Amino acid sequence: MLSPRAIGTALIGIMLTAVPARADTLLIPFFGVNFGGDAGTEFSDAFDTSQFNWGVSIAFMGGGIFGVEGDIGYSPDFYGKTDVGGSGVLTATGNLVIGIPFGGQQGFGIRPYGIVGAGLLKSKSDFGTGVTDIDENDLTWSAGGGVMMFFGTRAGIRFDFRYFQTFDDLEILGVPIAQSPGKVDFSRASLGFVLRF
């Protein structure tokens, strides 16, 4: 027969046993609006700029507060469109994530987070004039944050804000890494549907 002392010691031992932290993989399709900076700037004879964006993020959050993320966003008609063609901006960045899970990593929970990263910003226009058409690949950095709210173990929503800016001219140890004809910058606000695995 077990004594009350042995049972108490066993219960305390069970409660103090570390539970392994669970890593999360997040798939987040999103849509939103661009604003500020170059968002809404018409190029040449273009009209009807669109500030709409859509894309997808894939994040891996470790068992604590740190994670990594890949983010791809597309903004159609970013510089406007003509009767002949249009324009668009594509961003593809890799980011470091810091996010604190309130409520745990299963069931209902809230996770505010911040991101910082770098990647590619591709600007392209095909207005049919040849003179004002652009096709540029620039290095960009991004920073921002937001909050994810989970309604259960597998699904939630994300409110996200990010700022993107291309590097003007970047040199490391005298070696040119990026040479940009001009800075492109804008902010992106989006709403995403989060699938947690």
Language model features with spans:
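Sec/Tat signal peptide C-region and signal peptidase I cleavage site
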Residues: 19-23
